[in-house]
Amino acid sequence: MAVEGTAFDFRTPHAIGDMIDADNEQLKNGRGYDMNWVLNREDNGEVVKVMSIYEPQSGRAMDVLTDQIAMQFYSGNFFDGTYDGKYSKPLAFRESVVFETQKYPDAVNHSNFPSVILTPDEEYKHTCIYHFYISR
C-alpha cells in the first residue's frame, strides 16, 4: 500500500494523534494504528535507524535501529485500564506505543516475500536497538 497522502505517511514527522482517527477502514477496525510498515530496505543484515519518536514537552526521544525489513506499530488502541503497566499504573486507551521489528507478516504464504522458513540446521538472529535520549 502506498502511504503518500494517507494517515500512514510518517516519512515527514508529525504527531501520531494528528491522523489516528482519519476516515480509514484499517484505522477504524483497529481503533487506531496496528499495522505493519515495510521499511523500504534490503534484507542484508545491516543495522540502520528506521524510525524516531519525540515528545516535545519533556524532550524524551527514542530511535529504533534494526536489521529487519518491517515493523509493527501499535498505538495502545484496546487498553482500557484493565491491565497495569509500570509501577502498577493502569494502561489507558492510546497512552502507549509499541514498535516491533520483524519480517513481513504472513510471509510463509507469499513466495514473493523474503523467506521466514528456518531449517533445523540454521540459527536465527536479528538485531533491534531502542535508543532512548533527551532532545531539547
Question: Which residues does each PLM region occupy?
Answer:
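Active-site pocket scaffolds in enzymes
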Residues: 5-136
